[in-house]
Amino acid sequence: MLYEKFEHNINNLIGGFGLSKIAIAVSGGSDSVALLYLANIWAKKNNIELFVLSVDHNLRDQSKQEIEYIQNTANDLGLKFYSLFFDHQNNFSNLQERARKGRYDLMTSLCQKLDILVLLTAHHEDDYIENFCLRLERKSGVFGLSSSSVNWHNNTQIIRPLFNIPKSELVNYLATNNIKWFEDQSNLSTKYRRNTIRQKLAKEEVYIKDDIITQQIKVNELIENKFKPELISAIAESVKISEYGFAFLDLIKFSGFSQEVRVQLINFLLIIISGQQRSARFYSVEPILKLIRQSLDFKNTLHGCVIKRMQNKLLIYREFGKKLPESKLLLDKQLVWDNRFRITKNHNIENCVATYLSLEDYKIIKEKLDLEVLKNLSCGNHNAILFTLPIVKILEKVVAIPHISYYDNDIKSFNVSFAPDFTSRFTHFY
């Protein structure tokens, strides 16, 4: 039966955590509504408080009806309900990806406020099949083709207990129990590649899906048993990440790793140093690997980073390009700047802005800067890296560059730590 399969999955995924409360993402579609009812049975059985979270993207006319239905259903089940709103700001560029990130940002931020460690989502077997086909079409490497029923976002564990359950079983469960759900009409639109793949798969014989599932399982086993342990060892042996927000890669050790791990290792460093959430495509990393194999020094840019070879070392540091980091007002004690640096204010100082060092600011204060430590650590690349570090300004005046201990008075009013907002399912321990 469906519930027994669900119970087996969720107990294996989080049964030993001893949690007292869990959140669940519900959209109103058949997948998440089925998950809501299944999770409610399990939560009551295990004396766990369930919190229902729903995000209104304000993109469809029926979204308000869906939110109202989910709220009423949660109330009927005796569950706490939270409605969140994603503001797309009338910017429809790359909307699916932005909405996905915004949705997870909103839900995991609320989980942190509610002291909830786990968020359940309704990704089912058909979703995994579609993802595999999409990634295969995009020529993803073996790491990109792999999947997991456990992920992380914003230090919240994302659990997918329906990973081996087909959508048809979820729909049948709802229909049998006379439970209402909503159909998202955008799922029929062929302007989204995923929908086209879904429609093609629906016409295929069952054995085609079974073959894809078998391939997915083999890839996952290969990652778990071979490449994931190698990647963790590779990071420990060959990578040095500096508090100044740059990294060195030992190319002699790097040459001894498998091709799959070399690609993932470069991607790992690009994400950490750039502060971006998503990895670079395999086809964009491959030219860098070719340059490395040529054993010649080079300097290139990729994924918001400068990649520079110096003999047997590869230096990677931030590159802003035309997209400069947002300046942020230090209203609270702490903030994260450029998704990489955590700035702490030690004293109650007003009108503080965290931003980047401009050339004009540098010209004013350059005679007062001591860059010797940064110069030694970065093998002479201190000038370039200096302009990637956070500074603090008050009324347009640079008052602090904490990394190089520059302050315009004797009070050390600010501290900075390198804390990129990134968690990888390949390197995260839980």
From Swiss-Prot:
**Where is it localised?**
Cytoplasm
**Annotated residues for binding of ATP:** S27, G28, G29, S30, D31, S32
Please state the Enzyme Commission number of this protein.
Answer: 6.3.4.19
Question: Which EC class is this protein assigned?
Answer: ligase
Q: Name one GO molecular function term.
A: tRNA(Ile)-lysidine synthase activity
Any Pfam family the entry gives? ATP_bind_3
The reaction(s) annotated as catalysed by this protein in its Swiss-Prot or TrEMBL entry are: cytidine(34) in tRNA(Ile2) + L-lysine + ATP = lysidine(34) in tRNA(Ile2) + AMP + diphosphate + H(+)
**Its Gene Ontology biological processes?**
tRNA modification
Keywords attached to this Swiss-Prot or TrEMBL record, sorted alphabetically, are: ATP-binding, Cytoplasm, Ligase, Nucleotide-binding, tRNA processing
Give the principal location in a single coarse category.
cytoplasm
Quote the cellular component terms of the Gene Ontology held in the record: cytoplasm
What is its biological role? Ligates lysine onto the cytidine present at position 34 of the AUA codon-specific tRNA(Ile) that contains the anticodon CAU, in an ATP-dependent manner. Cytidine is converted to lysidine, thus changing the amino acid specificity of the tRNA from methionine to isoleucine.
Q: Note what the entry says on domains.
A: The N-terminal region contains the highly conserved SGGXDS motif, predicted to be a P-loop motif involved in ATP binding.
Give the UniProt family note.
Belongs to the tRNA(Ile)-lysidine synthase family.
Stated name of the protein: tRNA(Ile)-lysidine synthase
